[in-house]
Amino acid sequence: MNPNQKIIAIGSASLGILILNVILHVVSIIVTVLVLNNNGTGLNCNRTIIREYNETVRVERITQWYNTSTIEYIERPSNEYYMNNTEPLCEAQGFAPFSKDNGIRIGSRGHVFVIREPFVSCSPSECRTFFLTQGSLLNDKHSNGTMKDRSPYRTLMSVKIGQSPNVYQARFEAVAWSATACHDGKKWMTVGVTGPDNQAVAVVNYGGVPVDIINSWAGDILRTQESSCTCIKGDCYWVMTDGPANRQAKYRIFKAKDGRIIGQTDISFNGGHIEECSCYPNEGKVECICRDNWTGTNRPILVISSDLSYTVGYLCAGIPTDTPRGEDSQFTGSCTSPLGNKGYGVKGFGFRQGTDVWAGRTISRTSRSGFEIIKIRNGWTQNSKDQIRRQVIIDNLNWSGYSGSFTLPVELTKKGCLVPCFWVEMIRGKPEETTIWTSSSSIVMCGVDHKIASWSWHDGAILPFDIDKM
């Protein structure tokens, strides 16, 4: 075979192989398309991934097809029903730990907000910790002077319960130096108070959007609960104060639907003082235990009906639960009048259990240190001193602070009753410690049908921080 014949033979063979390759590729494509059309959902190469972002952003649907991705944004379905919340409170024999954020310990080296007034509130699908930031981080120069209650830098933010109040997981809620928040079953409602002391404004947000406002009506530091508001059958209730902290002020109950105020009523309470109420739903009504910052070491009680009628008085128990306070043995108790003649006070809480009451208080009578919850037989209706249960949450060697109530809805627990829960703030820094800042962490407890041993779930951060030594 001469050279020309060899070239022709090799070329013919190559052309034949090429044609065969093309035919095989065409057949392969046809078969693949036919199979995918007939049974596309059964192959691993075609899959759908659903990711959900926070509460109100979107659902992202990604369909992956070999090396091609198609991204489609669809509306996130909203919750269809309002929560009922007319069930009774569950009977609690003790309180078990639910969460602890350790924010200050983590904040010594993490990006954690300087906060105060943390509180917890729950939706049908989750519980969140809300807190008022100071627009600054722990162990940073902007934390200097954060003992101040009211500033233009304060904002209400939230994280999923148990998370520290860090910059990476926190969600902005409102501009506020006083606040409340609750979920009606469909969306979150927040009330954030901000502005100058004599003309403060409360902005009502629903689903993250401003819907209504409340202007100061007494011109003296309009303020609200610093704990969860209460929603029953789609109507949400909260209490506000406007006026002096050390004498008679003005108090109002507000009612909103979908974030729009549909009712309000003034509370007549001459001689009494109401601030920072801790409220919860119970048998279709809103029950609140509040703070008397004027004279009483017993706590005001407020029970609100759906038509905004109310009863107001004081926790009857013959054991005082505010701080500062006198000796238990010297306190008689009253259902109608403030007793104790001790000014100032601290936000606190309690739960009615029939005619009994669970009531939280600091262990110290004079300072915000230690924390215990006690059960007083007939303490809701009588001047009883019969303490039938006591559980220590924080020992008296460690700082506590505000405390407040919330409930776990039946949608979360699948019970036929509302689980009573509470949180305790643990304040660190100024004025008790040598730092340039004031902040706090929290421990959260929920009622169970067993006795729980006392212990100390204290903050545990080692102070001062590096910034305090400069």
From Swiss-Prot:
InterPro entries: Glyco_hydro_34, Sialidase_sf. One of its GO terms (molecular function) is exo-alpha-sialidase activity. Residues 1-14 are intravirion. Residues 89-470 are annotated as: Head of neuraminidase. The keyword Aminoacyl-tRNA synthetase does not apply. It is a single-pass type II membrane protein. Pfam families: Neur (PF00064). Disulfide bonds join C90-C417, C122-C127, C182-C229, C231-C236, C277-C290, C279-C288, C316-C335, C421-C446. It is an enzyme of class 3 (hydrolase). GO terms for cellular component: host cell plasma membrane; membrane; virion membrane. Its EC number is 3.2.1.18. The keyword Hydrolase applies. Ca(2+) binds at D292, G296, D322. The chain crosses the membrane at residues 15-35. Substrate binds at R116, R150, E275, E276, R291, R368. Keywords: Calcium, Disulfide bond, Glycoprotein, Glycosidase, Host cell membrane, Host membrane, Hydrolase, Membrane, Metal-binding, Signal-anchor, Transmembrane, Transmembrane helix, Virion. N-glycosylated. Glycans are attached at N39, N46, N54, N67, N84, N144, N293, N398. Residues 32-86 are annotated as: Hypervariable stalk region. One of its GO terms (biological process) is viral budding from plasma membrane. Its cofactor is Ca(2+). Belongs to the glycosyl hydrolase 34 family. The influenza A genome consist of 8 RNA segments. Genetic variation of hemagglutinin and/or neuraminidase genes results in the emergence of new influenza strains. The mechanism of variation can be the result of point mutations or the result of genetic reassortment between segments of two different strains. Catalyzes the removal of terminal sialic acid residues from viral and cellular glycoconjugates. Cleaves off the terminal sialic acids on the glycosylated HA during virus budding to facilitate virus release. Additionally helps virus spread through the circulation by further removing sialic acids from the cell surface. These cleavages prevent self-aggregation and ensure the efficient spread of the progeny virus from cell to cell. Otherwise, infection would be limited to one round of replication. Homotetramer. This is Neuraminidase. It comes from Influenza A virus (strain A/Equine/Alaska/1/1991 H3N8). The lineage of its organism: Viruses, Riboviria, Orthornavirae, Negarnaviricota, Polyploviricotina.
